[in-house]
Curated annotation (Swiss-Prot):
<keyword id="KW-0963">Cytoplasm</keyword>
<protein>
    <recommendedName>
        <fullName>Citrate lyase acyl carrier protein</fullName>
    </recommendedName>
</protein>
<dbReference type="InterPro" id="IPR006495">
    <property type="entry name" value="CitD"/>
</dbReference>
<keyword id="KW-0597">Phosphoprotein</keyword>
<feature type="modified residue" description="O-(phosphoribosyl dephospho-coenzyme A)serine">
    <location>
        <position position="14"/>
    </location>
</feature>
<dbReference type="GO" id="GO:0005737">
    <property type="term" value="C:cytoplasm"/>
</dbReference>
<dbReference type="Pfam" id="PF06857">
    <property type="entry name" value="ACP"/>
</dbReference>
<comment type="function">
    <text>Covalent carrier of the coenzyme of citrate lyase.</text>
</comment>
<dbReference type="InterPro" id="IPR023439">
    <property type="entry name" value="Mal_deCO2ase/Cit_lyase_ACP"/>
</dbReference>
<comment type="similarity">
    <text>Belongs to the CitD family.</text>
</comment>
<comment type="subunit">
    <text>Oligomer with a subunit composition of (alpha,beta,gamma)6.</text>
</comment>
Length: 97
């Protein structure tokens, strides 16, 4: 999926996260800010990369502001932001697991 506009998903509440996504030329850039980065940073990054790969997102800027979200919340918020940022492209529903 090609990111064509900026999009947001999520909140800055406890146990949630805010996902900001924007178009960018070149490779995918992921920035993660988290209160629990030392304990769970590797897992957060893994979930983000797996979700973006499943949705075939290979370019863009993704900023994650995490407040202790579970993996399922990270996936859902990221999927929402990507779908909003892709606008009218045909959706591959099977990629949303």
């Amino acid at each position: 999926m090609k990111i064509v506009k900026e999009a947001l998903a999520g909140t800055a509440e406890s146990s949630d996260l805010m996902v900001k996504i924007a178009p960018a030329a070149g490779e995918l850039e992921i920035e993660i800010y988290s209160d629990v980065i030392k304990q769970f940073g590797d897992q957060i990054r893994r979930v983000v990369k797996e979700t973006l790969a499943a949705m075939e997102v290979y370019e863009g800027l993704v900023i994650i502001e995490d407040k202790g979200a579970l993996d399922c919340v990270i996936r859902a918020r990221l999927q929402s932001a990507v779908l909003r940022a892709c606008e009218a492209q045909p959706l591959r529903w099977e990629a949303l697991k």
